[in-house]
C-alpha cells in the first residue's frame, strides 16, 4: 500500500504560521543536539520540551522571557521581541551540576544508584503505586474516545512547485501542519472509536463496550483495508505507565515506574516546579543501554503524599534498536477527580516512521481522551459473558449527532474532508490501472469488478511444480460477500502436464453471521462442504500456506513419496468472542499411492509391485476439536486469516474416530492430539516461544494412519516444523514434540562494537521429537509378518528409539537489512540414516519493529 502513495503522491506542504517560534537546541562545545530540553516562558506553569533530536516549537509571546534548561547545562533566558527570528539555534553551555551529592554532567561518568536522591524518590514512587491504583475500588468506569490518524509525513515544500502537483488542488487542500511535530503531513486515513470501560473488583472482571466506530481513508480502496487499522491498533496500543511492562510495537518496554525500572533506567532530578498549580518533582530518565527496548523521557511527580504521576513524556533513545521508527513521542496527563484521586485523562502518541531514509515517510497519530470517571456500583448484567470486548450492534452506523456528543477531540480540516479526498484520488487519471496492479500484488487476487462479486486467485498458485505433475497450472476463484453475505463458493481447476491429470476443488460455505467480505472473518460460525481431487505429499498438511505456492515449491530434498486423494468433507466451526473455537468434521477420503510411495499390505509380501496400481486406502472419520486462545486478534486477507498478536496462549485438544464400513471406510481407529503454545517475555532479553505437542494413535493401523513428524521440506522458515526431517522419515503411534525459540532481540549484538551498528538480532532454537511405535503397529516384527492390516513401511521411513529423541538446533541472525532472517539448522542425531542431512540454511522475509 505504501508504494501506491509513492507512485501517486509527491510530497506536499504549506507554510507554517508566523506566530510560532521553532528551532533546535545544541551543545555549545560539541554542536550535538540536546534532546528533551525544557522550553517555557518565565512565570508560566506550562512546560514544553524539545524532541529527541533537539527540535522545539512554541507559541511566540513578544515581551516575555523564553527559558531553555537541560540537565548538565546552564539555563539560558532570551527576551522575545518583534525582531526575534522565527527560526532559532539555541546553544547551551555545559556545566557540572550537583544535586544532593549526585553529580550530573554532559560527559560520560559513572552512574551510581547508591545514595542517589533520584533513585530514592523513584523507589518511593514505585512503592506508592498500589495505594493510588483505581482498581482498589470495588467498581469504576470511564468513557474513552480514541482517534488514529495515518499520514504521509515531513512533506517538502519545494516539491509543491512541481507543475503537476499544482494542478491537483484537491491534494494540496489535504495537506496540513501537524500540531505534534510542526511538519507538513498528508492524512490518508482516520479511525475513531468511542467506548465505555467497566471494572469490577470481586469477582474480577473488565469489559470494554464499543459504542461507536468510524473509519475512512485509503483502506476503503482495497477490500482487505481493515488490515491497516487492525495492525496499527495492535502495534500502537494504549500505554499505561503504571504497568510494569508496556506493550508497544508488539514488544514489551520496561515502564519507568515499573518494578524493574530502578535497574533498567538511570534517573536524574531536574527541578521542582509547578504544573497546572500542582507542585511536582521533575525527573529525566534513560535506559542503561540505549539500544535496549526502553524509553527516554521525563516525569513530573506530585510533591505530596500520593507521589502520583502528574505528567509524563516518553520517547525512544536516539540509538534505539527499534526498526522503522525515526521518532516516537508519548505525552500523558493525569487529572484530579472530584474524590481527590488521580486518573489518566490525556494520552497522545505520535510515531514517525520510514522504511528506508530515501523513501516516503509516514506518521501515526493516536489521540486518546478519558472522561466521566465514576465509582458507583455497576449492575452485574453488564459483566455477563466471557467476552472482554463487546460491540454495540449499531457501532458502525452512528449518526453525526452521536459523534458531535462523543468526539472529545475535534477532527482537523483534512480529517473532516477525508471522504472527498479519497473520492478525488480514485478519479485521478491512471489511478485505476495502478490500483488494479497493486491490489493484485498486495492481496494476491484479481477483482473482477469495482464491487467484486468474484475474485480470481491466489495468483502465486497459478504455476508450480511437483514430482508427479512436473509443470502444473491452476486457476482458482472465490465469491465474496458482495454476492451473498452468508453464502460463499470457491474452488480451482488444475492440470498436471507430465501426469496428464486434471484436478479440482469445490467448496460451499454457509455463514450463520453476516460477513463483510470473506467467510473466515472473526467470529467464524460456518458450515462447509468441500470436495477435492488432487495430488499431494503427506507432509503438505503441515504447511500453513497453500501447497501450490510457487515460493515453497523449491525443496531441499526430492519429494517423491506422493499420493492422489479424493476427499469429501463436511465441517462445522463455531467461534466465541472470548476465544473458544469448536470444530466438528465428517470426512471420507480415498488415497492412491504414487511416485515412490506404495500401500502394500504385509500379507502380499513377495508379490510383484504393479506400477499401475501402487495401492489404495479409504477412510471415513469424524473429528472434534477445541481451541482456546483468549485475547487473540487477527487480520483478514483474501486467502486466510492471520494472527496479529502472538502473546495470548493457545490450547488445542482434538480426537478423531475412524469408522470401518461407513461410506467405504476400511479401518477403525482413534487418534488423540493436544498442544499448548505460550510466549514468555524476558524484558530486555527478548522473548521465548514454547510449543508442546503430543498425540496417540490408539489402534492397530497401516502406516498411512500413523503419526508422522511435521516436516518442512522447503527453504522457507515455517513455525513449529522440523527443518531437517525428511518426508515420512519417522512413523510413530505415540509422540511428543517440543519447539523452543529464543529471540534475544539484539541483547548480545548490541554490546559488540561495530556489529551493534548493524542492528542484527540473535535467534536460538531447539526442536525435539520423542516417538515410539508399539509392537502392534510394527511391521518389522516377526509376529506381524502376515498381518493383513499392516503395511510395509516406505523406503526411507524408520522407527524411532523411544530412549533417544530426535533433536535439531537452530542459530540465526534476524533483522538483516531490517527484513531478512537467516537460520542455520544442525541435526544432532539419527545422522547414520541414509536420508539424514546434518545441516541446512533456511531463510525468511519478515518485517518487525
Predicted features, each with a name:
Residues 26, 70-73, 85-134:
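Short, acidic, small-residue-rich periplasmic hinge/interaction motif at the N-terminus
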Residues 45-55:
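Short, acidic Ser/Thr/Gly-rich low-complexity loop/linker segments typical of extracellular
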Residues 21-27, 54, 90:
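A short, amphipathic beta-strand motif
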Residues 108-280, 286-294, 356-457, 461-464, ...:
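Structured extracytoplasmic
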Residues 251-253, 375, 385-849:
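Exposed, low-structure sequence patches enriched in small/polar residues
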Residues 31-35, 57-64:
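Short Pro-Gly-centered beta-turn/loop motif in secreted/extracellular proteins
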Residues 21, 28-43:
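Short, ordered, surface-exposed loop/turn motifs in non-cytosolic proteins
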Residues 41-43, 65-78:
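A short, solvent-exposed loop/turn motif at the edges and junctions
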Amino acid at each position: 500500500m505504501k508504494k501506491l502513495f509513492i507512485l501517486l503522491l509527491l510530497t506536499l506542504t504549506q507554510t507554517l504560521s508566523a506566530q510560532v517560534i521553532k528551532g533546535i537546541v545544541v551543545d555549545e562545545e560539541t554542536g550535538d543536539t540536546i534532546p528533551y530540553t525544557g522550553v517555557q516562558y518565565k512565570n508560566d506553569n506550562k512546560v514544553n520540551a524539545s524532541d529527541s533530536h533537539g527540535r522545539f516549537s512554541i507559541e511566540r509571546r513578544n515581551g516575555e522571557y523564553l527559558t531553555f534548561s537541560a540537565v548538565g547545562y546552564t539555563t539560558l533566558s532570551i527576551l522575545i521581541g518583534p525582531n526575534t527570528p522565527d527560526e532559532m539555534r539555541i546553544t547551551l553551555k555545559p556545566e557540572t551540576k550537583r544535586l544532593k551529592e549526585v553529580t550530573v554532567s554532559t560527559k560520560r561518568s559513572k552512574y551510581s544508584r547508591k545514595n542517589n536522591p533520584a533513585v530514592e524518590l523513584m523507589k518511593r514512587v514505585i512503592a506508592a503505586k498500589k495505594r493510588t491504583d483505581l482498581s482498589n475500588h470495588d467498581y469504576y468506569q470511564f468513557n474513552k474516545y480514541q482517534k488514529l490518524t495515518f499520514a504521509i509525513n515531513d512533506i517538502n515544500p519545494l516539491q509543491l512547485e512541481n507543475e503537476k502537483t499544482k494542478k491537483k488542488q484537491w491534494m494540496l487542500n489535504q495537506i496540513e501542519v501537524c500540531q505534534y511535530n510542526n511538519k507538513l503531513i498528508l492524512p490518508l486515513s482516520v479511525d475513531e472509536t468511542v467506548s465505555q470501560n467497566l471494572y469490577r473488583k470481586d469477582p474480577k472482571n473488565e469489559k470494554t463496550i464499543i459504542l461507536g466506530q468510524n473509519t475512512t481513508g485509503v483502506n476503503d480502496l482495497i477490500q482487505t483495508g481493515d488490515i491497516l487499522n487492525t495492525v496499527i491498533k495492535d502495534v500502537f496500543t494504549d500505554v499505561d505507565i503504571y504497568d510494569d511492562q508496556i506493550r508497544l510495537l508488539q514488544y514489551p518496554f520496561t515502564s519507568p515506574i515499573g518494578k524493574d525500572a530502578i535497574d533498567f533506567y538511570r534517573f536524574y532530578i531536574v527541578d521542582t516546579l509547578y504544573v497546572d498549580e500542582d507542585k511536582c518533582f521533575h525527573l529525566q530518565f534513560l535506559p542503561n543501554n540505549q539500544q535496549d527496548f526502553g524509553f527516554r523521557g521525563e516525569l513530573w511527580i506530585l510533591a505530596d503524599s500520593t507521589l502520583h504521576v502528574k505528567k509524563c513524556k516518553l520517547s525512544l533513545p536516539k540509538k534505539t534498536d527499534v526498526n522503522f521508527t525515526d521518532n516516537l513521542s508519548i505525552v500523558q496527563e493525569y487529572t484530579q477527580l472530584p474524590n481527590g484521586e488521580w486518573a489518566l485523562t490525556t494520552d497522545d502518541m505520535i510515531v514517525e516512521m520510514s522504511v528506508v531514509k530515501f523513501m516516503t515517510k509516514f506518521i501515526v497519530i493516536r489521540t486518546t481522551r478519558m472522561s466521566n470517571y465514576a465509582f458507583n456500583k455497576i449492575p452485574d448484567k453488564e459483566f455477563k459473558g466471557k467476552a472482554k470486548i463487546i460491540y454495540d450492534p449499531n457501532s458502525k452506523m452512528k449518526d453525526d449527532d452521536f459523534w458531535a456528543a462523543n468526539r472529545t477531540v475535534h477532527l482537523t480540516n483534512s480529517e473532516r474532508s477525508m471522504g472527498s479526498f479519497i473520492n478525488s484520488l480514485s478519479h485521478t487519471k491512471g489511478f485505476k490501472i495502478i490500483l488494479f496492479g497493486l491490489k493484485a500484488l498486495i492481496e494476491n487476487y484479481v477483482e473482477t469488478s469495482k464491487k467484486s462479486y468474484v475474485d480470481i486467485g491466489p495468483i502465486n498458485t497459478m504455476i508450480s511444480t511437483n514430482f508427479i505433475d512436473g509443470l502444473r497450472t491452476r486457476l482458482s476463484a472465490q465469491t465474496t460477500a458482495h454476492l451473498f453475505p452468508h453464502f460463499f463458493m470457491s474452488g480451482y481447476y488444475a492440470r498436471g502436464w507430465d501426469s496428464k491429470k486434471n484436478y479440482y476443488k469445490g467448496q460451499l460455505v454457509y455463514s450463520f453471521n453476516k460477513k463483510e467480505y470473506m467467510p473466515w472473518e472473526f467470529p467464524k460460525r460456518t458450515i462447509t462442504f468441500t470436495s477435492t481431487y488432487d495430488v499431494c505429499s503427506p507432509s503438505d498438511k503441515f504447511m500453513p500456506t497453500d501447497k501450490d505456492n510457487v515460493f515453497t515449491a523449491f525443496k531441499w530434498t526430492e519429494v517423491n513419496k506422493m499420493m492422489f486423494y479424493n476427499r469429501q468433507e463436511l465441517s462445522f466451526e463455531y467461534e466465541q468472542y472470548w476465544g473458544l473455537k469448536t470444530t466438528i468434521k465428517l470426512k471420507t477420503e480415498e488415497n492412491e499411492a504414487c511416485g515412490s510411495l506404495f500401500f502394500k499390505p504385509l500379507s502380499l509380501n513377495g508379490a510383484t509391485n504393479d506400477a499401475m496400481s501402487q495401492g489404495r486406502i479409504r477412510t471415513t472419520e469424524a473429528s472434534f476439536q477445541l481451541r482456546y486462545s483468549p485475547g487473540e486478534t487477527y487480520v483478514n486477507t483474501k486467502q486466510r486469516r492471520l494472527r496479529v498478536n502472538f502473546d495470548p496462549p493457545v490450547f488445542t485438544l482434538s480426537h478423531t474416530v475412524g469408522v470401518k464400513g461407513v461410506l467405504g471406510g476400511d479401518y477403525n481407529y482413534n487418534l488423540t492430539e493436544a498442544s499448548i503454545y505460550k510466549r514468555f517475555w524476558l524484558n530486555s532479553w527478548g522473548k521465548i516461544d514454547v510449543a508442546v505437542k503430543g498425540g496417540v494413535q490408539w489402534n492397530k493401523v497401516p502406516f498411512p494412519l500413523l503419526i508422522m513428524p511435521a516436516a518442512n521440506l522447503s527453504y522457507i522458515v515455517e513455525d513449529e516444523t522440523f527443518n531437517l526431517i525428511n518426508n515420512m522419515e519417522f512413523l510413530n503411534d505415540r509422540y511428543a514434540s517440543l519447539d523452543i525459540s529464543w529471540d534475544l532481540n539484539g541483547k548480545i549484538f548490541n554490546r559488540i562494537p561495530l556489529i551493534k551498528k548493524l542492528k542484527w538480532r540473535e535467534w536460538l532454537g531447539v526442536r525435539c521429537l520423542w516417538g515410539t511405535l508399539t509392537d502392534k503397529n510394527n511391521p518389522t516384527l516377526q509376529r506381524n509378518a502376515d498381518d493383513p492390516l499392516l503395511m510395509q513401511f516406505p523406503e526411507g521411513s524408520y522407527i524411532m528409539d523411544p530412549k533417544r529423541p530426535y533433536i535439531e538446533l537452530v542459530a540465526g541472525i534476524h533483522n538483516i537489512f531490517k527484513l531478512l532472517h537467516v537460520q542455520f539448522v544442525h541435526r544432532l542425531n539419527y545422522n547414520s540414516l541414509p536420508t539424514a542431512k546434518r545441516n541446512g540454511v533456511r531463510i525468511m522475509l519478515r518485517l518487525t519493529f
